[in-house]
A protein has these predicted regions:
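N-terminal positive-inside, membrane-proximal cytosolic segments immediately preceding the first
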Residues: 1-25
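C-terminal capping alpha-helices of c-type cytochrome domains
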Residues: 18-43, 160-212
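Alpha-helical transmembrane signal-anchor/signal-peptide segments
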Residues: 44-65
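Electrostatic cytochrome c docking/interface patches
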Residues: 65-101, 113-118, 212
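Gly/Gly-Pro-rich "capping" loops immediately C-terminal to redox-active cysteine motifs
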Residues: 77, 89, 97, 112-165, ...
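The canonical Cys-X-X-Cys-His
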Residues: 96, 102-112, 163, 179, ...
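Residue-level detector of secondary-structure transition/capping positions
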Residues: 104, 113-116, 171, 206
Length: 212
């Protein structure tokens, strides 16, 4: 009659058994984490922008560049926006942002100064959370990659004339630019509503941030 072998398993076999169970444990843990995340997202109130600050429309918060556009291009400005002031500024700002999104400007330009790649030396201090706490950043436009310069604090860096020339023919102001022409921002050589609006938006970016 045979005897029962009670000798311990070889060391390699005893170590292999827990390792064989590891993928199953990892799968179960992954599903548990997934369920927890779904439940938390389902029961947690997600911010819809109720507590964010809106761009302040009073005259003192409107960049000087907006009034300069009205002086430099009085006829198209009045035709499309009326007199320069809080109401026309809000309209231009909204249309400008919509144009920025529709034209894919966010694909080549960021609105976030990062702590890497020499960004602070080129564009100033690293972007902080409160800097984007306004309704114009819902949804955010941090960008997808950096082809052109960061625009997070573009306000006042360049003149309106520079932006007009740049949109009309980018290589006229930067021979190595890969940016396309935006001729549909103009009627003849003067900016139309989209042209005035997107320049207004760009000249606003960062104007609501106290520079230190």
């Amino acid at each position: 009659m045979g005897t029962l072998n009670t000798s311990p398993l070889p060391r390699d076999v005893s170590m292999r058994q827990p390792m064989e169970r590891f993928p199953l444990m990892l799968l179960v843990a992954g599903w548990v984490c997934y369920v927890i995340v779904v439940v938390v997202m389902a029961v947690t109130r997600v911010s819809q922008g109720d507590d964010v600050q809106t761009p302040d429309p009073p005259t003192e918060s409107i960049p000087v560049a907006f009034f300069q556009l009205a002086e430099d291009y009085p006829e198209p400005f009045r035709n499309h926006l009326g007199e320069p002031g809080p109401e026309s500024f809000k309209v231009a700002l909204q249309v400008g942002r919509e144009t920025y999104i529709a034209e894919g400007c966010w694909h080549c330009h960021t609105q976030q100064v990062r702590p890497v790649g020499g960004d602070p030396e080129r564009f100033g201090r690293v972007t902080f959370a409160a800097e984007s706490l306004n309704v114009m950043n819902f949804p955010h436009l941090l960008g997808t990659r950096r082809v052109g310069p960061d625009l997070a604090r573009e306000s006042g860096r360049r003149s309106n004339d520079w932006h007009v020339a740049h949109f009309y023919n980018p290589r006229a102001v930067n021979p190595t630019s890969v940016m396309p022409r935006y001729g549909w921002f103009f009627d003849g050589r003067e900016p139309n509503k989209k042209g005035i609006a997107i320049i207004t938006y760009i000249q606003w970016l960062g104007s609501n941030v106290e520079q230190q």
